[in-house]
């Protein structure tokens, strides 16, 4: 009763403060109260279920899954049975939910879909003229969020039978490889794969899409979202024909590197294998390798206390621990690095430790069932009235491609001398593995940890990704910036002003209010005509350079509202982070591993020689100290 009353008061305070003065201008305690109040309001109004006919999993068999596999003790490979009463919830193949009312979530069609032209939006507002860095962060911060997104979501293969044709202007040299004097364009983009589960019950409702990965924060980017995928990485050389490791570990080679993906070698030579290995680059290679090694280290620790346990038991318990550690790192390290202010750090770390703080949590364990007091882990599971799911709006605000540089410099971790340089193409897909031919794993990790990522502002989208070769032999290229704009429209994500309205935020009424940069005000007016037409991604990047931008934040306040809601939801809805985050489920050693370790410890464990470079750095997502 008391907590409900507190929620009511905080919710009212959040609405009042939003109408009068932004929380970003309030004193610490008042700002923190407003942020918590925004979460209360968003939970009440912005968790929307899209399922109309959830699947019945009774009697289902998964090939290869041991008969004694207990979903109460372990995470199911496909994410099912996290919620024992609704076992389909959050599993791979379940629909994306929404963070806006269904009436606000209809996809744009026909001329609206291409108005204004996504390619022209890319050219005039997103093209990187010169690299705008974030000097307070390192490139591993950019790699980390892609590592997380691959855990949470994927829309799967596009529909080869449905093409969206984007016209190009006469002065637009597209595609990049066209013959001299050949006609321009158009740019053809495959439509997002349709949802085959729609029935008559979906008539008159917005378009839906299915998540091909599990919705849960279960490290599926490392472990995969199916038993078959998980099995491949437990076999010699990552080959289906390889001998299975029965010790509970992943297979790594003699250098501790990942196996190569046997299915991809013809198309993408040297492409590495992991749970999710799409859109691969050296930053992902480093993180997947680190947490594959971390899994094996956790297995070694668990075996000390459980010498007679089977390899399967060790593997699945280690997965629980590894996934929880990754979630903790994101919550208390990565997110505060991107929200580098007193209130931002407290708000996000509070998801894990509550207002009582880290020291009390580590010293006395769970001191309250209140998530505000003690943090979410260990408190009762709560879906807040809507089945758990990742959402289309969450996908939209995590379009953070501007964080990526176009150029990389690889240097020795011993003396900082330059070993070689590569562009983004030269470190992507199978080329990522070739980095280790001229630099050690430690050198590569050191190099990315001492270089800055890009800022989430206009005119800073990587040009490599704006001229991306998909099938160059067939003349198929892609402008990912234009595709980002198109996807939000295609999937029914409201445009910037409508999005803010759907979240209960104050209305932006002019381009001058949107951004403080006069040149961008002019360009935005030229491209969009009216403020209501501005796309969500463009609005968020423009907002970054305004008086409303939260101090120390790496993204806009508009995007932050979704983070407030969904960061807590990923923990609170997940049984293994809430009710079952206990020593009994994780084992005492596993539970302690999560509580006592962070990203700094993971790196020190697997690359101990790098410790002097980050020992004096407050957060390992900040730039490390240079060698020499």
Where are these predicted regions, by residue range?
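N-terminal accessory/cap region of cofactor-dependent oxidoreductases and related radical enzymes
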Residues: 1-297, 301, 320, 324-482, ...
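Mobile, glycine-rich extracellular loop/lid and propeptide segments
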Residues: 303, 311-314
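Alpha-helical scaffold segments that form or flank carboxylate-/histidine-based iron centers
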Residues: 314-320
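Residue-level "edge-of-site" marker
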Residues: 500, 513
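Extracellular/luminal domains of secretory-pathway glycoproteins
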Residues: 506-510
